[in-house]
Amino acid sequence: KGLDIKLKGSAAKELVPVNSSKSYALVPDDFVGVTPKVVVAEGQHVKAGEALFVDKKHPEVKFVSPVSGNVAAVNRGARRKVMGIVVTPDAKQEFVEFGVKSVHSLNGEQVKQALLSSGMFAFLRQRPYDVVANPNDKPKAIFISGFDSAPLAPNYDFTLDGMKNELQLGVNALAKLTDGKVHIGIHKDNASKVFKDVRGAEVHVFDGPHPAGNVGVQIHHIDPINKGEVVWVVNPHDVVAIGKAFCKGVISFERPVVLVGSEVIKPLYYKSYFGASISNMVKGNVKEGANVRYIS
């Protein structure tokens, strides 16, 4: 059961570099279940990988700057709710160095501490509720959906091309966090070159229309969550970023962004960074006068 909605404006498989954004922002609402405590002040200089805010309930879970630069604004809304922290990037980037670590030689607790110290733990989601994972929990399994069945969704085989080693290292790290299995879902109509040869994970082949790519659907069919149990889910690009953090010793916020839709002049994949403004991507590439709504 399901439905594939055929929308106009799919992207060509072309990855285009985009000029550096004039500002980058971390938005607490993107991290469901977190009550942010800001740990920087406006005007303060931060390195890429340095904490901008932490979770009040679990202060060991920190949310770090994607770039080095000056904190331009701590935007607040009603009742002083933190709406976003904006960083103006340096011309030359500086990174917090966490040190190269061998995943093979680490135990689960050491891997978790490495993810917490680097800020990568913030990208682990917990089911039920799809909130940021609780570091005190032990998931019964970890799930990665290797395809997105939503309309105009990015093709992971394309965006992850050439990242097989980092993906494998990320899977190796995640496997240390659970006594169960790491599960990867792929679609039968997709060759899934990136995922099918991953070691240390159980690969499952799915068939059918959307929402087959939703990780919740895959959990339901592979290892349903019973009362009192939790599983963790991770986006494939975040798995790669975890792998890079261990093999390079610095956090990587490089992410592909796909600009698609019927009002886009030339739908493309852009090589960008987490938290970047989309202004450089949409400028001159969206039909003028169109009543456009941007959906992320």
What are these language model-derived features?
Residues V34, V40, K57-E60, K266:
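Short, solvent-exposed loop/turn positions at domain surfaces
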Residues A51-E60, A78:
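Short, charged beta-turn/beta-strand-edge "cap" motif at the junction between a beta-strand
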Residues V38-A41, K227:
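Short, compositionally biased leader-like segments
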Residues K1-V39, V54, F206:
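N-terminal, Lys/Arg-enriched amphipathic/low-complexity engagement segments
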Residues V61, N75-S296:
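Buried, small/hydrophobic-residue-enriched core segments of structured protein domains
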Residues E60-S68:
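Short coil-to-beta-strand transition motifs
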Residues V40-V54, A73:
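Short, well-structured beta-strand-loop connectors
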